Amino acid sequence: MDFKILKEKLPQSNLTVVLTGAGISKESGIPTFRGEDGLWKKYNPEELATPWAFQRNPALVWEWYDYRRRIISKAKPNKCHLLIAEFEERFKNVRVITQNVDGLHEAAGSTNVIELHGNIWKVKCTKCDFRGINREVPLSKIPPECPKCGSIVRPDVVWFGEPLPSDKLTEAMELSQRADLFIVIGTSLMVQPAASLPFLALERGAFVVEVSPEETPLSRKAHLFFQMGAVEFAMKFEEKEG
């Protein structure tokens, strides 16, 4: 029944927002970098993904990102990434907000994506205004250098202790407040400010749907809660087509 309700809501919605987190990418073989999953050479991500770690030892931080980029380069969008891209084709005004930095939504064909935490394939210079794409795997030089001024570049991602880019956050909040339908997939809703977005949507009267194998602070408040993984959700959604 719940799938039937969701299928009725999708074509009726004037603005559908899909918020995704690490859970969707985990099913493409990308570790969540939390808990045991996240350990690399006995370091926790919280020790490496910070401006202070980068200041102290940029080569170590880049070694970890090189390792992550190798994993991500082998990953393919899964059925749920593809389903979300299909929503954009089939229904009006579908926007994706993601906490993931892997670029798998774009690889699946989604075009309206806000990457709240940045993108692992993008770099920015620590000295000048250079920003660009670096898809080299593995990196030939660690740390990589700016093609413009020769200084070290860093991953263009949001690290622990850094604010989200204000333009992206503002846009994400505005979309959440305007959404008729808000779908949350694969996020534990523990990291602010992204965790507040579905609650903003709820307050403004959106129909809120959650897909998660575990209960989250949203689960009992959502109009529909699919307690399952992202790929299982996509397969069941497609099974019940027609």
Curated annotation (Swiss-Prot):
Catalytic reaction list: N(6)-acetyl-L-lysyl-[protein] + NAD(+) + H2O = 2''-O-acetyl-ADP-D-ribose + nicotinamide + L-lysyl-[protein]; N(6)-succinyl-L-lysyl-[protein] + NAD(+) + H2O = 2''-O-succinyl-ADP-D-ribose + nicotinamide + L-lysyl-[protein]
Note on domains (UniProt): 2 residues (Tyr-65 and Arg-68) present in a large hydrophobic pocket are probably involved in substrate specificity. They are important for desuccinylation activity, but dispensable for deacetylation activity.
InterPro entries: DHS-like_NAD/FAD-binding_dom, NAD-dep_sirtuin_deacylases, Sirtuin, Sirtuin_cat_small_dom_sf, Sirtuin_class_III, Ssirtuin_cat_dom
Sorted UniProt keywords: Cytoplasm, Metal-binding, NAD, Transferase, Zinc
Compartmental location: Cytoplasm
Residues that, per the record, bind substrate: Y65, R68
Domain of life: Bacteria
Cellular component GO terms, alphabetical: cytoplasm
Keyword match Metal-binding: yes
Function: NAD-dependent lysine deacetylase and desuccinylase that specifically removes acetyl and succinyl groups on target proteins. Modulates the activities of several proteins which are inactive in their acylated form.
Cofactor: Zn(2+)
Gene3D superfamilies registered for this protein in UniProt: SIR2/SIRT2 'Small Domain, TPP-binding domain
Family to which this protein belongs: Belongs to the sirtuin family. Class III subfamily.
Binding site residues for Zn(2+): C125, C128, C146, C149
Gene: cobB1
Ranges where the Deacetylase sirtuin-type domain occurs: 1-242
Cofactor annotation remark: Binds 1 zinc ion per subunit.
Stated name of the protein: NAD-dependent protein deacylase 1
Record-annotated active site: H117 (proton acceptor)
Binding site for NAD(+): 21-40, 99-102, 186-188, 241
MF terms (GO), sorted A to Z: histone deacetylase activity, NAD-dependent; NAD+ binding; protein-malonyllysine demalonylase activity; protein-succinyllysine desuccinylase activity; zinc ion binding
Primary subcellular site in the record, as a coarse category: cytoplasm
